[in-house]
């Protein structure tokens, strides 16, 4: 039985990769990588996101200047059709991932009830 659970997990992984929503994220990501300005903006977003996550994990809040930078970056992203499409595709995929997470972790939640 223990090996069977890994087979199911691998099957789920393949099913996620086959989702049209996953394929759309890949497609848009490739388009971003092929466009220097979109790629640079995406890299800037990732760096900002990592910085903010690090700050939040250490209990810090972004300064007013950093909040302004975040807002400006968000506006640039909204103005870029490829990045906008990427985040929309990510959002559609995240619906599936949230549902899968809820289903997979239900037995663990039962253990703490």
UniProtKB/Swiss-Prot annotation:
Transmembrane segments: none annotated. Signal peptide: none annotated. Disulfide bonds: none annotated. Gene3D superfamilies: YheA/YmcA-like. Pfam families: Com_YlbF. It comes from the Bacteria. HAMAP family: UPF0342 (MF_01526). Belongs to the UPF0342 family. This is UPF0342 protein Spy49_0636.
